[in-house]
Amino acid sequence: AMDTWLASVSQIEVPAGAFAVTNPANTKEVIGFHHHSNSAQMEQTVTNAEAAFPTWSATAVTERALLLNKLADQLELHRDELLALCIKEAGKTVGDSMAEVREAVDFCRYYAAEASKNLQAAQARGVVLCISPWNFPLAIFLGQVSAALVAGNTVVAKPAEQTSLIAVRTLELMKAAGFPDHVVQLVIAPGRQVGEVIVPDTRIQAVMFTGSTETGAWIARKLAERGGEPVPLIAETGGQNCMIVDSTALPEQVVDDVISSGFQSAGQRCSALRVLFLQEDVADKIIT
């Protein structure tokens, strides 16, 4: 995927077979291109990850944790570039983009620290499929990938096709941090195609997924159809998040918090506010 990534903010012709990535705030602005993986390429990514597993899983957990900390250093070094990508490709605000990069750094350092303390005798599973969403294209992508890697697994990472350039750049930074070839394999393609080809592959030993409840249930069914030993699935899907407001709350602050929680990322967040409970004493002030 890295070989076919072309970063550009100019209006140039789309390369043959590539898909243009546009700024969601200005769809006439092309910020880059990517190619979708076909079935044969998807199968090859699993093969590459499987081949890299014996050496990577035998690497000392302290060394794997050290590489995560080096990746965190790379993220901080390239913070401004990653901010720009989050804004241009994912349509995030500056504030949200800053929080996104910080969260990605925190994930790397957190899993590095926890692994060093708790995974000395743990046994890795094998190849893990990580499927991440567009609304947190750096933080959730790296949260999944870093957790799987530091435990000694190799990874096939499937970012949302809408925000794949961020994932490609992250892989470049992983390479700069010293991660070996093939321990992380990137697949860029529509989710259904990836699900049909990779999820049923018996070489996949675990799946991490963040997205819709419907898709999470579909993945669970596909894994169950494989039979044999159950395949671990970590699925983070939608939720019904509520806010309870009593008479001690400042109405103007409540309104501001409700709007930001419910409508940032167009409401497309697992943590977005869905239900508001108001004490009668303050209900009229807040609603009107």
Please state what every model-predicted region is:
Residues 176-178, 206, 214-288:
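ALDH superfamily catalytic-core signature
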Residues 158-160, 188, 246:
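Short beta->alpha connector loops at strand-helix junctions that form conserved
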Residues 185-208:
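A structured beta-alpha segment of the ubiquitous adenosine-cofactor-binding alpha/beta core
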Residues 51-59, 73-77, 81-84, 88, ...:
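Conserved helix-loop functional segments at active or binding sites
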Residues 1-47, 51, 58-74, 84, ...:
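Terminal low-complexity tails and localization/encapsulation signals of metabolic enzymes
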